Amino acid sequence: MRQRAEEEAKNAFAEAQRALRLEEKKLAEEEDMLERMVEDRKRRREEYSRKLASGEMKVTDQSSANRFLDRMKEKEVEQKDRIEAQREQVRRAEKEVKKAQDALIEATQALKALQKHKENW
C-alpha cells in the first residue's frame, strides 16, 4: 500500500513537472511574441521616417501612420499583460511542483520506514 502511494506520488510529481515545463514554454512564446512586436513597430517607425524624409510619404499620411504605430504600442501593452498573467501561471505551476515533491519525499520516507521496520521484525 505504501509502495502504491509512493508510485502515485512519483506520477503526480512527474505530471507537475510536465505542467511546469508547458507553462514555461508558453511564457517564452509570449515573450518572443512581444519582442517581435516591438521590433516590427521600430522597423515601421524607421520606415515611415525615411519615407517622410525622402518625400515618399505625404505629411497627411503621417497622421495615419502615427495612429497605426500607436495601435501597435497598445497591442504591446496588451501582450505585456498576457505575459504577466502567464508568469503567474508559471508561479502556480512551481508551487504545484514543490507540493508534489514534498508529497513524494513523505511517501518515500514512509515506505523506507516500513521496509526498515520489516527488516528489524
Please provide the spans of the model-predicted regions:
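Charge-rich amphipathic alpha-helical interaction elements
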Residues: 1-121
